């Protein structure tokens, strides 16, 4: 008897990303429009720009997605880590959105591939946020206890699914015959639940933060947004607006310049009013709407070194970053490489290393642009103790340093 064909974790990841994209397009039709317009923009950009694929092949860019999910506590985050490991996605970076200009009561990491070949094959990544319930500025003792009790009662993932994920991660893949059911179950775990929402509990959490309500006010998690990659985000923004899609007011991240694109630029269409059922305190179930899910799009540039990141932060602190950009950054890749501001494979200015991660200010800005009001923060110090070491210990996994990963890629010779 011949042995069944095996699929590696990277192949499973490609199927997982495609499955989530298909599901989200069915749930949020405007996302399908976004993907369609991205494809048109990318095709047109490729015909106009000789070096359009300098930061990734069109095949990679077209397939590229990042997702965002939210969980409530370390146990749930650890379960997410176990599931994503089966797709070759490891935790990279630490983001504290409580420190943003518009604070959000979450701390986050991103699960993604870290190997260059895996990134080239399929770079799917998921920005994963955990509710910061230990922060007394948002949650007093009584509310914290009730949130903890609520989270302890729910189960985000079938234990059998997690057991299978751990086995696949340990083996580096699975038999092809087992893959469809596993991927389908993993995708289904992030579908929007149709269970009625307890209205009084959801409303109470909403007074703290709409994000807190989205995390701990419902019995499951879901894809909050999926994000295709586009080569010209300004053109994308214009085309979406022309189609009558309401976009947020700005493009988050660095300004458009004549020099090399750096880091990450993001925008989105506004969160849509989606019908949900609500359960009142007397048990009555009535229809209502929630605005929690939206469609984001991103354009990625070259990864900056710590020195380059310092200059970026200085430029973005200006009232008009575009006006001062040239005082912080040169206009060519050769100068960027010579000054040690960005990462290039083997030091070759013609081989930029794409930024694979996120910007906390942009993430918080996107979240805030799709909320009706700011989070309510109380007075007092931040004594919750959240940091990258705490998060790594809480989930029992090493959280990779993005700069160390870029340094390693930069040591490789150009292919």
Swiss-Prot record:
It comes from the Bacteria. 2-oxoadipate binds at residues 66, 70, 225, 361. Its EC number is 1.13.11.93. It catalyses: 2-oxoadipate + O2 = (R)-2-hydroxyglutarate + CO2. The keyword Ribosomal protein does not apply. Pfam families: HGLS (PF07063). One of its GO terms (molecular function) is dioxygenase activity. The record marks 70 as: Important for substrate specificity. Fe(2+) binds at residues 66, 225, 296. Keywords: Dioxygenase, Iron, Metal-binding, Oxidoreductase. Its cofactor is Fe(2+). The keyword Metal-binding applies. InterPro entries: HGLS, YdcJ_bac-like. Catalyzes the decarboxylation and hydroxylation of 2-oxoadipate (2OA) to form D-2-hydroxyglutarate (D-2-HGA). Belongs to the 2-oxoadipate dioxygenase/decarboxylase family. This is 2-oxoadipate dioxygenase/decarboxylase.
